[in-house]
């Protein structure tokens, strides 16, 4: 199974999460703002920062470039200052393209996007990633 991990972050916490997800999956986590071309993939992990309940427009612009037949499944992880899940718009955009979404998104609460990931959250990220991998591997 081909797996890709991409993220959009202006802080440290989400980048840390993306790197952990990538490490577990055996791939490099790629910043959406870097020059790259996303190949077709079976499973895409997408990381996004949530600021004041909103996802940066750059994420939506990036996702608009996906041809609908290049990604089979996706899972979203995010960092939110208030701990709420604001990833619904991103999920809907991907489902509209015919991409199967993992039914639960991972939201990590962080009072600062520049803090360090706690051990509790680190374990949460690992468990989430392993659960998604099992679900998409059958």
Protein language model regions, located:
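FMN-binding flavodoxin-like domain, especially the glycine-rich phosphate-binding loop
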Residues: 3-4, 9, 13, 17-28, ...
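N-terminal short beta-loop-beta anion/metal-coordinating cradle
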Residues: 30-33
């Amino acid at each position: 199974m081909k797996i890709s991990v991409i993220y959009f972050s202006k802080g440290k916490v989400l980048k840390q999460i993306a790197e952990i997800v990538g490490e577990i999956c055996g791939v490099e986590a790629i910043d959406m703002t870097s020059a790259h071309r996303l190949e077709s993939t079976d499973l895409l992990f997408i990381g996004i920062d949530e600021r004041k309940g909103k996802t940066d427009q750059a994420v939506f612009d990036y996702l608009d470039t996906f041809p609908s037949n290049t990604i089979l499944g996706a899972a979203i992880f995010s960092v939110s200052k208030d701990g709420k899940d604001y990833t619904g718009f991103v999920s809907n955009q991907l489902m509209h393209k015919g991409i199967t979404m993992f039914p639960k998104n991972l939201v990590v609460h962080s009072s600062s996007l520049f803090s360090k990931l706690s051990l509790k959250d680190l374990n949460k990220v690992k468990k989430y990633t392993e659960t998604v991998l099992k679900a998409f591997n059958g």
